[in-house]
Amino acid sequence: MNRRKFLAVSSAAVAGAVAESSAEAALAPAQTNSASSIGLDLMRHRFGVNYTPSRNWWFCWNDWDTGPIRRDLDAIAALGADHLRLMLIWPFFQPNPKWVSQAHLDRLAQLLAMMGERHLDALVTVFTGQLSGWYFLPSFNRLSDGFYIDTAMRSAQELFVRELARVMKPHDNIIGFDFGNELDTCWSAPLPQGDAWMAEMFKLMNQLLPDGLHVNGVDHHPWFESDTFSAQALAAARFPVMHCYPHWTGADKYGGAMDPPSVKLLAAMATLIRSFAGTQGIPVWAGEFNTCLKDLPEKGQAEWLEKAVHAAIEQGVSWFSYWDSHDVDHKFQFDPVEYSLGLLTNDGRVKEQGRVFQQLAAAYRGKRVNFPTASLPSPPSDRTVNGTWQWILTWLEWKA
């Protein structure tokens, strides 16, 4: 399924200045220990989650209460996670191109400090223009506003990144920046424009946080077809990221949830990425993964998770960040597929997939990554979603 079509149906643009509520004083960024000795070693496995706050989703940036967040972090740490991917709702943080909200920056600092206390590292996702089926666009941008080439947009983006780096730098539990949440689903561009912007953003982020690991967390489309960023440029990054969902990629068209197109999707996409890199010897990060099959019960989701990660480990995937930590509260309007994706329920119960995640993290975290030694196929010659799927099915030796 094309997520842009989903967004067009289910989303309404949320933009404009956000009134600041009274904020707690920012916690001092205490020097905290990183999650483990693994650090940024891409040759050792790590397990984390995409954090979804149990209370008020990411609207919590505007209705700040550290109590529920602390409970969330305790529960996530108890599952054996060592890192979280955080979503900064862009218009909440930067409602004006020349101003970033200090109150929201203080809340980010608090969150980073609370995570550090629990030995959880942070990947901070910056330009979150869409998330879970909703658009979040700042008042100075629309989908057609030249996100990648407009000089005024570039100035606003640079201000935001610089302000974030200032807040993040004192904390020692920082992984780095993720450019945004699947930027290609929100802002499209010809490949040369997307690649040039990506190169400049990597340069800026490396200057500001030179010890960080910075990534571009696109969805599957740039890997499956020509879309905004070239697969070759993405694969040349220090740590290519893939977002893998049987539902969104269309894997469920080629078999059931436990058939190879779904349970070996992570493994297949890692091979696809390496085919564009031209070598088996590169680390790959599963930055988001789940089935997004809303009719799959907990037991089935847990079984899929176990099989998918084992297959990905065999194919040399380095880090795993599950989508997501907590189910979404039904008091909010979301597409039904979004409500039950957590390892924990909204009230904190550990689900069956949460227990499997805990077992996988205990078994593999810190273990050395073994890259595959099989010959690497050439990239798909047909750069369409269907053409890429035929390439994957051939690699899987699966006939739908």
Regions found by a protein language model. Give the residues of each.
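Short acidic/His/Gly/Ser-rich catalytic and metal-binding motifs that mark active-site loops
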Residues: L131-S139, W248-D252, D329-F334
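Active-site mouth of glycoside hydrolases
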Residues: A35-A237
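Aromatic-rich peripheral "rim/lid" segments of glycoside hydrolase catalytic domains that contact
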Residues: C60, W323-A400
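N-terminal export signals
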Residues: K5-A25
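Substrate-binding cleft of secreted/luminal carbohydrate-active enzymes
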Residues: F289, K294-Y339, F357
